[in-house]
UniProtKB/Swiss-Prot annotation:
It comes from Xanthomonas axonopodis pv. citri (strain 306). The keyword RNA-binding does not apply. It holds the Pfam family Aldedh. Dimer of dimers. Its EC number is 1.2.1.8. This is Betaine aldehyde dehydrogenase. Binds 2 potassium ions per subunit.
């Protein structure tokens, strides 16, 4: 029997069953246990959600920005009050260690909601004089009903990153969580309703892409789509959204990010950064620095430091607060990661550690893959070129800065990049040449609410977070006012 009762759709401020009657199993990846049967939304459910969202958005947009901000801040307070319970649910559904979900997932999502609740009041137009008797002004108006599609690695955080600017700007949102990890998005919908959000302003439609995802991107009454996921799926979403009704899109997509360790770097600091950039959340982070470039002369010393740190990883039950490394999110994803590892071996990369599924003792039913490090990698290897989205670090050597930058940029991706060096002049010189939307110097992975997040090239379109994202959920209206008698040429 599933641990939780059937999970319904959330439309119009309440739970409703899917009209088609179909459900999807949601599994605990640490044990293989079925957590719940979740109703699988279809096109009829989407139409109902759009009708609800249109009605709710009219009420929501009619409120002042101060009134909207107060409601969003009440939701922030509820999120923080329920952090532990939400984190535990997130851990059950994603397999991420409780030590992570308690300190990062809900916390950072709430931070973003708090940020937009504050800056929403600064969303102002401009008044510009043209001549003595004429001027124009601009208004930032909400788009209306927007759609969002989340990924399975940071379910509640992604839901909040997408909902916060959209709602702060006066829109309604229909959110489709990943069918793998939909549970906390439903709890978020409850919290928004409890905080006072008008019914219909935040609807949640669990379901797979075939049943509801494609319909969401094509729906003519949805004005914008925000998507987080893989690049291949992102292309399909973008094509569908544009071909149906020229929707605006925001895309936070995949990456194969470089981390350049400079010759003057503290190798202990660099190894700590490389570990976090590859094995946090079991490697299921889009910004992971999976291509680690190290000077050829430092390779062996750096390998030794990495291997020593791998020994300190605590692999186990994600609900155990001592655990720092959990399973992958699903059996299917685990299999894809293992296939990439086998390809790395076949193409000649030298396996330093890991490279296998973990099935000892209590791990036997879970989707655990050992922290894996390959050395002697080359740029043409599949594990170096393709996003794996798992705990697989590829170590590459270089001889000079120009070579490192050229090879770091030789990818279709451009999400993130990092440099480790005590020389800030060198750091800026390298960072300014790296083709990536998010760059870190002597650190990795932090994405505070005011910091825009997004990629270059095929890693995305538009940005999440930051002030510009709030404006991206509005449309600008220009209004000219003539104070003098209008002079016609006829």
């Amino acid at each position: 029997m599933p641990r939780f009762p059937d999970q319904l759709l959330y439309i119009g401020g309440r739970y409703v069953p899917a009209r088609g009657g179909h459900t999807l199993e949601v599994v605990n990846p640490a044990t293989g246990e079925v957590l719940a049967n979740v109703h699988n939304a279809g096109v009829d459910d989407l139409d109902a959600a759009v009708d609800s969202a249109k009605a709710g958005q009219q009420r929501w947009a009619a409120l002042t920005t101060v009134e909207r901000s107060r409601i969003l801040l009440r939701a922030v307070a509820l999120l923080r009050e329920r952090n532990d319970a939400l984190a535990q649910l997130e851990t059950l559904n994603t397999g991420k260690p409780l030590s992570e979900t308690r300190s990062v997932d809900v916390v950072t999502g709430a931070d973003v909601l708090e940020y937009y609740a504050g800056v929403a009041q600064a969303l102002q137009g401009a008044q510009v004089p043209l001549r003595e008797g004429s001027f124009f002004y601009t208004r930032h108006e909400p788009l209306g009903v927007v759609g969002a599609i989340g990924a399975w690695n940071y379910p509640i955080q992604i839901a909040l990153w997408k909902a916060a600017p959209a709602l702060a700007a006066g829109n309604a949102m229909i959110f489709k969580p990943s069918e793998v990890t939909p549970l906390t998005a439903l709890k978020l919908a409850e919290i928004f309703t409890e905080a006072g959000l008008p019914d219909g302003v935040f609807n949640v439609l669990p379901g797979d892409g075939a049943s509801v995802g494609t319909a969401l991107t094509e729906h003519p009454q949805i004005e914008k789509i925000s998507f987080t996921g893989g690049t291949a799926t992102g292309r399909k979403v973008m094509a569908s959204a544009s071909s149906s009704s020229l929707k605006e899109v925001t895309m936070e997509l995949g990456g194969k990010s470089p981390l350049i360790v400079c010759a003057d770097a503290d190798l202990d600091v660099a190894a700590d950064i490389a570990m976090m950039a590859n094995f946090y959340s079991s490697g299921q982070v889009c910004t992971n620095g999976t291509r680690v470039f190290v000077p050829r002369a430092l390779r062996h010393a750096f390998e030794a430091r990495l291997l020593a740190r791998v020994q300190r990883i605590h692999i186990g039950d994600p609900l155990d607060e001592r655990t720092t490394f959990g399973p992958l999110a699903s059996a299917a994803h685990m299999q894809r990661v293992l296939e990439h590892i086998e390809q790395g071996k076949a193409e000649g990369a030298r396996l330093l550690c890991g490279g296998e599924r973990l099935q000892d003792g209590a791990l036997v039913q879970g989707y655990y893959v050992a922290p894996t490090i390959f050395s002697d990698c080359t740029d043409v290897m599949t594990i170096v070129r393709e996003e794996i989205f798992g705990p697989v670090l590829s170590l590459l050597t270089y001889d000079d800065e120009d070579e490192a930058v050229t090879r770091a940029n030789a990818t279709t991706y451009g999400l993130a990049a990092g440099v480790v060096t005590p020389d800030l002049a060198r750091a800026h010189r390298l960072i300014h040449r790296l083709e990536a939307g998010i760059c870190w110097v002597n650190t990795w992975g932090e994405s505070p609410a005011p910091m825009p997040v997004g990629g270059y090239k095929q890693s995305g379109v538009g940005r999440e977070n930051g002030l510009a994202t709030l404006q991206a959920y509005t449309r600008t209206k220009s209004v000219q006012i003539e104070l003098e008698r209008y002079a016609s040429v006829f």
